[in-house]
A protein has these predicted regions:
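Contiguous, non-catalytic segments that form substrate-binding/exosite surfaces or channel walls
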Residues: 142
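Flexible, gly/proline-biased loop segments at the beginnings
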Residues: 1-139
């Protein structure tokens, strides 16, 4: 990027100046995990922009607020009070989901079923920056996902 010294401006490169890696760049050495960015650090880059840029944060928060709106409602408000054993309400979980959707374009939830598997007992938000997809199989199906807070450190 070319810098102009007088006002410390940066010129944004043209569309064609960007490097677009091939698909092999996004697989680990075993070929199972699809990387999120060339160094597998794209989510941390997005979070850094969100935390360091008030304009970026304002835009992301506006999208989040548009998704959340007035929050979740139901005729029996007590249903919304507890989503999991950590004491989070459904609206707490929904706000986290909306922020991940605004930042990353996706979200993840951990759903805990009862022992007899007849009802959902807990729902937890999973930080989307901790999630990576397994490589697609030959039929184009993603067989699973990996969750780790250490992805950007590898």
């Amino acid at each position: 990027m070319k810098e102009l010294n007088k006002h410390r401006l940066t010129i944004i490169p043209k569309y064609g100046d960007y490097y677009y890696p091939d698909s092999k760049t996004f697989e680990d050495d075993k070929g199972k995990i699809v990387y999120y960015g060339q160094q597998n650090d794209f989510p941390s880059s997005i979070i850094e922009l969100y935390n360091k840029s008030s304009i970026n944060a304002t835009c992301v928060n506006a999208i989040r607020d548009g998704i959340v709106g007035g929050g979740l409602t139901t005729q029996n408000e007590e249903v919304l009070n507890i989503a999991n054993r950590d004491g989070e309400s459904w609206n707490d979980v929904f706000k986290k989901v909306a922020l991940d959707r605004s930042l990353f374009g996706g979200f993840a939830l951990e759903v805990i079923w009862s022992k007899d598997r007849t009802k959902v007992t807990d729902v937890y938000h999973i930080d989307f920056s901790y999630l990576r997809a397994h490589r697609m199989n030959e039929r184009g199906i993603i067989p699973g996902y990996y969750v780790s807070s250490e992805f950007q450190n590898k």
